[in-house]
Amino acid sequence: MENTIVRAENYNAYFGDNHVVKDVNISINKNEVIAVMGPSGCGKTTFLRGINRMHELIPNATAKGKILLDGENVYDMNAIYVRSKIGMVFQRPNPFPNLSIYENVIAGYLLNGIKVSKADKDVIVEKSLTSAALWKEVKDSLHKKGTFLSGGQQQRLCIARAIAMQPELILFDEPTSALDPISTSSVETLFHELKANYTLIIVTHNMQQAARVSDRTAFFYMGELVEFDDTKQMFTAPADQRTQNYITGRFS
């Protein structure tokens, strides 16, 4: 499909002999918001980390199968390039504590030795913070440490850091689980705005959040992709009994 941005083909992930993601096949389109849900230990975060080759950074972790980005297997690409095209935002806000807000935004360039002029850095910082709905709040405090910000602001700073590398796809691993309700609402609003320019894949334990923010939802159980469908359809008439059991709270 011409509109497909990322596709998994028979993707499997392991920690040693532990088979944690099993034969996943899924196609995700450009400018979609995808929720990935399932009980703890079902493989959803491991799958997410496989998309941008972060799974392989864990000792004793291996993978088989393909993850295709724009039709090309990410395992045939330079890993640093892959992680610039596929950004990631983690569960807890993690700005670099010794860097200023300004430096945090361009950290990807600094860490990878990519030379950028001061004028270009200024443009990248303003555009990225604006896209993350943070510029107006911090434009007069760019010299302050990233940890100076509130939890919700720190998470939006981390989103700006991902955006700065001009990715096609942004992965979110339970990005609001450590935030208060007001900050969570701000980040969820941001998801809808980011969809215009990026594809978002969001791992969440919060079924209400999945229903609010996503176009389609993937349900994982015991390492398997059980169901992948339009979010409204999945929540109102799931095709698989295991999905129904999870949604209705029969297991968690």
Language-model segments: what does each one mean?
Residues K144-L149, Q153:
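Conserved ABC ATPase signature
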Residues I170-D173:
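Catalytic Walker B motif of ABC-type/P-loop ATPase nucleotide-binding domains
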Residues Q166:
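Conserved catalytic motifs of ABC-family nucleotide-binding domains
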Residues F228-D229:
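ABC ATPase "signature
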Residues K66-N73, K118-D140:
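Conserved ABC ATPase "signature" region
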Residues N52, I101-L111, D122, S214:
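Short helical segment in ABC ATPase nucleotide-binding domains corresponding to the A-loop/adjacent helical element
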Residues N60-T62, N73-G87, L111, A196, ...:
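ABC ATPase NBD coupling module
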